[in-house]
Amino acid sequence: MQIKAEEISKIIEDQIQNYEQRVEMSETGTVLYVGDGIARVYGVQNAMSMELLEFPGGIMGMVLNLEEDNVGVALLGSDVGIKEGDPVKRTGKIFSVPVGDGVMGRVLNPLGEPIDGLGPIDAAEVRPVEIKAPGIIARKSVHEPMPTGLKAIDAMTPIGRGQRELIIGDRQTGKTAVCLDAILAQKETGIHCFYVAIGQKKSSVALVADTLRRHGALEYTTIISATASDPAPLQYIAAYTGCTMAEYYRDSGKHALIIYDDLSKQAVAYRQMSLLLRRPPGREAFPGDVFYLHSRLLERAAKVNDSLGAGSLTALPIIETQAGDVSAYIPTNVISITDGQVYLEPNLFNAGVRPAINVGLSVSRVGGAAQIKAMKQVAGTMRLDLAQYRELAAFAQFGSDLDKGTKAKLDRGARLVELLKQPQYQPMPSNEQVASIYAATRGHMDDVPVEDIRRFEAALLTFLRDTRKDVLDAIKEKQVIDEAVEKALTEAIAAFKQGWTA
């Protein structure tokens, strides 16, 4: 076979014409130091704050400190395979996570990756975890109720859509249980729920997921889990990941609820990172920007105005106190950021009052505008009655000769305390709460022995559901107790009491 010279030149010519010079440029650096989830990297001069850097083995790191000759990086994974001198590549991307309906019913890590073994996520889009909170013009005042299913909260410290209500108390006082009840109460409301576990035991997170699954609530809930064994940067970023996913619904004109369990552990993780990054410590060794850590997170919970879709994001952050000290640094910070707090007390919990809510110290600063009128009508005097009861109960220990009025207040208070007790994972619809509290505050339970109050309440609600459903439906529909509803409710309670035996 003879090769012709012109053919060779033609082939070479074609090759030259079709040649594409592909040069892949990437700015790289070198690891100077690594340990405890933190790395110092030299040579990535143009790195941005919050940018992702790629380490060997596919581990990502997030730039936190921008210094003169190196950058401080928080590693979003294990630092076991990374050593001094390893190459580090810039990605040019800001840390983002998947959002959309694909995350519903899933258990994810703070990077937005599934850890439940149910396959990949079908994401609508990806969004940065750090997003600026809505401005003043974009917001609307809280005016719609967000029921929790707990009588003590819905009656006296009501929560509205778009509110930030702090759940604060010592360990083992039922903080998580209150929040899980709030999730279970959203079954009929169409609110999308997010539970962010920060620094929890893996067994605790598994128990939460199992509880939600058993009650049919996991299908509208997403769990973001940064457990105690995860590196500090993952515990720090988990809350922002959950918030970004929940904001998708707020910005789509829908409603979302997010629970941060708990922000005390997030602050501890942030303190650990800050000290390792050599940032100067302040009070209780926390860095100076620990207030901003929580304020920029909680300010993203909002009720947005009608022109932006009228969606909302409600936040229930949890803070764990030490021996009831609410004047410590982190508790006071979060109390000042939120729109009220529900204070849970160990003494009440141990006395069998569950949920163990201290009515005197709990407050909702904006929720009153969101409470349904029917509840306002029946529970208006409740807080005062309970406050007087607590005061008189302390004095009543000293003397037995009480006048009629004092005795009546003590009896009414004891019955109200009993009425506000509620079993775990049994949220109560608003119309049933109204009927139950109406019976107590209007004196229909005054002749019922204190130990029989809960049995009386359960039997009364069963009676109303079975024979006088029209009364419950009227309360649900009108959301106000007018003359007709009051007359029907009084008659129904009287009819029930005739057939009820203690």
Curated annotation (Swiss-Prot):
Record's subcellular location: Cell inner membrane
EC number: 7.1.2.2
Transmembrane region(s): none
A GO CC term attached to the entry: plasma membrane
Residues annotated to bind ATP: G169, D170, R171, Q172, T173, G174, K175, T176
Catalyzed reactions: ATP + H2O + 4 H(+)(in) = ADP + phosphate + 5 H(+)(out)
GO molecular function, one term: ATP binding
Membrane topology label: Peripheral membrane protein
Site feature location: Required for activity: S362
Short name of one Pfam family: ATP-synt_ab_N
UniProt xrefs under InterPro entries: ATP_synth_asu-like_sf, ATP_synth_asu_C, ATP_synth_asu_C_sf, ATP_synth_F1_a_nt-bd_dom, ATP_synth_F1_asu, ATPase_a/bsu_AS, ATPase_F1/V1/A1_a/bsu_N, ATPase_F1/V1/A1_a/bsu_N_sf
UniProt entry keywords in alphabetical sequence: ATP synthesis, ATP-binding, Cell inner membrane, Cell membrane, CF(1), Hydrogen ion transport, Ion transport, Membrane, Nucleotide-binding, Translocase, Transport
Function: Produces ATP from ADP in the presence of a proton gradient across the membrane. The alpha chain is a regulatory subunit.
Assembly mode: F-type ATPases have 2 components, CF(1) - the catalytic core - and CF(0) - the membrane proton channel. CF(1) has five subunits: alpha(3), beta(3), gamma(1), delta(1), epsilon(1). CF(0) has three main subunits: a(1), b(2) and c(9-12). The alpha and beta chains form an alternating ring which encloses part of the gamma chain. CF(1) is attached to CF(0) by a central stalk formed by the gamma and epsilon chains, while a peripheral stalk is formed by the delta and b chains.
Family: Belongs to the ATPase alpha/beta chains family.
Name of the protein this chain belongs to: ATP synthase subunit alpha
Lineage per the UniProt record: Bacteria, Pseudomonadati, Thermodesulfobacteriota, Desulfovibrionia, Desulfovibrionales
Gene behind this protein: atpA
